[in-house]
Design a protein with these regions (language model features):
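A short, mixed-charge helix-start or loop-turn motif at secondary-structure junctions
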Residues: 1, 50, 113-117
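Basic, helix-initiating cap at the start of DNA-binding domains
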Residues: 1-25, 29-41, 54-58, 63, ...
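Short, solvent-exposed loop/turn segments at secondary-structure boundaries
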Residues: 6, 118-119
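Key DNA-contact positions within bacterial/archaeal DNA-binding proteins
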Residues: 44
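A short His-aromatic
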Residues: 47-50, 54
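Hydrophobic alpha-helical connector segments
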Residues: 59, 70-99, 103, 116, ...
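Short linear capping/connector segments at secondary-structure termini
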Residues: 105-113
Length: 126
């Protein structure tokens, strides 16, 4: 049990470090060695959780997508006009982007068109 918790914490640390570097330097300009150093983990730990830099990008995009969907779902059925719901969603995303690099990096990856395999589901389909 403790080993699993430690593995989850290491994975989260790696994702946070990668997101910080992707956000500040860009995906293409960031190397795995820089992520390892920034996270304070070994290359073995990184490769245990992620086979390639693309897998890190995929994990960050999944978190960003899941968070965006949760925000939208929380607004659904509250009686807001379309414009007010969009404004609340935008403010919610902006608030989360200020709090940490993962969502900022996810948005940057999504808008930069970084290809990830397997592709994430399109946000406007079920």
């Amino acid at each position: 049990m403790a080993r699993q918790l430690r593995a989850e914490q290491t994975r989260a640390t790696i994702i946070g470090a990668a997101a910080d570097l992707f956000d500040r330097r860009g995906y293409e300009s960031t190397t795995l060695s820089e992520i390892v150093a920034h996270a304070g983990v070994t290359k073995g730990a990184l490769y245990f959780h992620f086979a390639a830099k693309e897998d890190l990008a995929h994990a960050i995009l999944e978190i960003q997508s899941r968070t965006s969907r949760r925000l939208a779902k929380d607004l659904d059925g509250r009686g807001y006009s379309s414009l007010e719901a969009l404004m609340r969603l935008t403010f919610g995303m902006a608030r989360l982007c200020v709090q940490g690099p993962v969502l900022r990096a996810g948005l940057r990856l999504a808008t930069a068109g970084v290809p990830v395999r397997p592709p994430l589901p399109h946000p406007f389909t079920e």
